[in-house]
Each structure stands twice: as C-alpha cells, then as structure tokens.
Amino acid sequence: SEMCIRDRNKKTVFESGAILIYLAELSGKFYNTKDRLEINQWLMAQMGYVGPMLGQHHQFHHYNPGKSKFGEDRYFKISRRIYRELDERLSNSKYLSGSNYTIADIGTFPWIARHEWHDIGLKSYKNLTRWYEEISEREGVKKGFAFMNESETPPKPCLLYTSPSPRDPK
C-alpha cells in the first residue's frame, strides 16, 4: 500500500518523501531554505537507497530467513555499507543535512530504528548511534512510537545482539 495524505483543502499528496516536503513547506519547519539542497540530497538518498535497501534486508533477514543465501549476503553487505556511510556523514555533521534536524533525518530515522532487524549492532557506529539516541529522545519521536503502539519506544542501541549474524565481523 502506498502512503497518501489528504489535507483540509482536499489536496492529496502521495509518497513519503513528497509528503515530508509538503508538510515541511506548510509548517515552515524542518526544511529551511538555506540548507534545502543538502536536505533534498539526503532525503532522496533515504528514498532511493537507505529505505529500499534496508527494506530488502528486512525481507531476506527478518521475514524470510534461510530462503536465499545470495539475498541475505547481498543485503547484509549493503546494510553494513549504509551504516558506514551514515556514520561517516555524521562524523562531520550533527544531522544528515547539517546542523539542524530536518525532514532528511525524519525520513531516515525509522529505518535505523529497526536496527535490531539488521544484525549489525548499531553501537559499532559511534556517530550514527549519537544521532539515533538524540533523535530517539525527541518528544515528537516518542509520541510517534506511542501512537503506533503504546508499549513500543525506540529500541536502544546495542553493540551485539543475543544472536548476532555470523556474517557480522566483530
């Protein structure tokens, strides 16, 4: 199913990235003009790379484990590369698109919030962990998790899982 919203004026917007841009422009928040190019680049990276690749990882590792060694290996390696790339970016920047929390962070965070499904160990990535923990403490993020499931909060980062993937080097 595709994500879609309809506003008070009966304007319909579909696709998560377009919805984030639309709502940010309406509210005047999380999408400042000065950093718009950088924000768009990181939001598009999430939409075209981070989300689809981690989504494939979920398919092979979480929903259908043991069905395709090729798929599991491929998406594990890509997921680890995504973590490294995000960690490297966040070594030079407080947030993905600069010094301010933006829709690029809002779009990317839910994928990293499923870090327990990635068999990687978030705490192995110092800068990504800092970013994740800081965003996890935002009131809006907590409210979002509570809205989806009252007992759920953003998962805490860990170094190793109780049953780490044999593919994940220490």
Where are these regions (language model features)?
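Residue-level signal for nonpolar/aromatic packing positions in well-ordered secondary structure
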Residues: R6, I19, L86, D105, ...
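Single conserved hydrophobic/aromatic residue that forms the stacking wall/gate
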Residues: E2-I5, Y161-K170
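Surface-exposed helix-capping loop/turn segments at secondary-structure junctions
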Residues: E88-S99, E139-G144
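Structural helix-adjacent loops and short alpha-helical linkers that scaffold large soluble proteins
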Residues: N32, R74, D119-Y125
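All-alpha amphipathic helical-bundle segments outside canonical DNA-binding/catalytic cores
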Residues: N32-E38, W42, S93-A104
